[in-house]
Regions:
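Hydrophobic/aromatic residues in alpha-helical transmembrane segments
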Residues: 22-26, 74, 110-111, 150, ...
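Helix-loop-helix units of permease transmembrane domains in multi-pass membrane transporters
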Residues: 27-61
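Terminal transmembrane helical anchor/hairpin motif
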Residues: 1-5, 125, 130-208
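Alpha-helical transmembrane segments
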Residues: 19, 23, 27, 32, ...
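Secretory targeting signals
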Residues: 1-21, 54-119, 136, 169-180
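Membrane-interfacial segments
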Residues: 31-34, 38, 74, 78-86, ...
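Cytoplasmic juxtamembrane interface segments
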Residues: 29-43, 105-133
Length: 211
């Protein structure tokens, strides 16, 4: 029960903070090319331009995966230090970790495309702020609305659900993650990765222009 409570709160925090953090990460990786106007220089490299999006995406993905792994390890160590009951519920830990990573990869694919397509990085940050809002309140939306906004997958892919018991009492129960949202996130990820590659392949190298 204590572990369930911890992971439920973690899912809520992920929905609020991860979209914004990913927006900043993707923006920083792409903004150096916008400020230095080095898109044309990158276009002279031996590698085709459609791999530029994928290479930057992989760099951000590795940073994101490392961050989520360290976060999970710190939470487990914290729980053991605080005397949480053992054994650790690995049947919850792994689905929550991979569910969070899956939802984050979608957000990263979208933010990477926006950051490369628009030179003004304020636009990318606004998209990240909107995603943070949807990720935080998405659990309150009906299921028909949540599937439209994959940011809401942070709550759906967490394996813990809050159930009201009374006026001021709540219980946390373990559930199976919603497989439909997994497939939906994968579909969005493939769409934006393909879109980003295609956009960079047709890149215009005029000064001040991006993908």
């Amino acid at each position: 029960m204590v572990w369930n409570n911890l992971f439920t709160n973690l899912a809520l925090l992920h929905g609020l903070f991860l979209p914004m953090a990913i927006a900043v990460l993707a923006s920083r990786i792409c903004d150096m090319e916008h400020k230095g106007d080095t898109w044309k220089l990158l276009g002279t490299a031996a590698e085709p331009m459609n791999r530029l999006y994928l290479s930057k995406f992989l760099c951000a993905f590795l940073i994101l995966t490392f961050t989520l792994t360290v976060e999970l390890a710190v939470l487990i160590v914290f729980g053991i230090w605080k005397g949480f009951p053992v054994p650790i519920p690995t049947d919850l830990v792994l689905p929550i970790y991979f569910g969070t990573l899956l939802a984050s990869v979608f957000v990263l694919a979208l933010q990477q495309w926006v950051s490369m397509a628009v030179s003004n990085q304020l636009v990318a940050l606004i998209v990240g702020m909107a995603g943070a809002f949807l990720g935080f309140v998405g659990a309150l939306f009906p299921a028909q609305v949540r599937i439209v906004f994959p940011w809401c997958a942070y709550a759906d892919l967490s394996c813990v659900q809050t159930v009201p018991l009374g006026e001021h009492e709540w219980a946390y129960i373990a559930i199976s993650p919603i497989c439909f949202h997994r497939y939906w996130c994968v579909l969005w990820e493939c769409l934006y990765i393909s879109w980003g590659n295609a956009t960079c392949a047709e890149k215009n190298f005029r000064r001040g222009r991006s993908c």
